[in-house]
């Protein structure tokens, strides 16, 4: 098992060297929500799809990448054109991401959103978002992405314990929080900032 790898960016080699202050974060989220509202005013989603909740999650995806680095000499790191985000089993979220990131970049790259319907379609994305799925399908996904520099993220209770690297959950006061599976990160080839770990709930500790 690999040791946990840390990064600590400075202002010269990454967009942000520290987590945003509370006022800055609130302003950032308000602006994103306003933009999303304008973009999505004519969009149609399933009745049970919470646009506000998933807009916040879309913002989190980009924020996570500010504190994660992909290893050198990999297709993810050296891809000159796009930052690839694959979404498994949630077409509404895929469409929302396309609307939000059609003019925005992640790690200085244009964002390409891919819909995935089964594990065999996974093609080394930078980030893979996994919606609620069966244990069998999740096991197949994690087997395919194990020991690869693909950041796995979900929003289903128990998925972090099962091997997903980052999982969203709702706190008791209905705030979006996230947990990180430390062992899953250790087994990946990703470099993660201690600053991200410090604000997450940690699961899978040795």
Regions found by a protein language model. Give the residues of each.
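Hydrophobic h-region of N-terminal signal peptides that target proteins for export
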Residues: 36-44
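Short hydrophobic alpha-helices and adjacent helix-cap/hinge residues
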Residues: 2-9, 14-15, 19-31, 44-206
């Amino acid at each position: 098992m690999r040791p946990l790898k840390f990064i600590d960016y400075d202002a010269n080699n990454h967009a942000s060297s520290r987590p945003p202050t509370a006022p800055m974060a609130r302003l950032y989220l308000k602006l994103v929500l306003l933009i999303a509202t304008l973009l999505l005013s004519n969009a149609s989603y399933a009745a049970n799809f919470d646009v506000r909740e998933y807009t916040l999650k879309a913002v989190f995806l980009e924020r996570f990448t500010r504190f994660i680095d992909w290893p050198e000499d990999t297709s993810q790191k050296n891809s000159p054109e796009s930052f690839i985000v694959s979404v498994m089993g949630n077409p509404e979220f895929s469409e929302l991401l396309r609307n939000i990131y059609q003019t925005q970049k992640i790690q200085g790259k244009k964002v390409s959103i891919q819909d995935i319907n089964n594990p065999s379609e996974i093609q080394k994305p930078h980030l893979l978002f996994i919606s609620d799925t069966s244990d069998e399908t999740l096991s197949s996904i994690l087997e395919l992405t194990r020991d690869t520099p693909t950041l796995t993220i979900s929003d289903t209770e128990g998925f972090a314990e099962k091997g997903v690297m980052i999982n969203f959950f709702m706190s008791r006061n209905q705030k979006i929080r996230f947990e990180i599976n430390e062992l899953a990160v250790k087994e990946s080839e990703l470099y993660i900032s201690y600053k991200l770990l410090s604000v997450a709930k940690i699961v899978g500790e040795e």
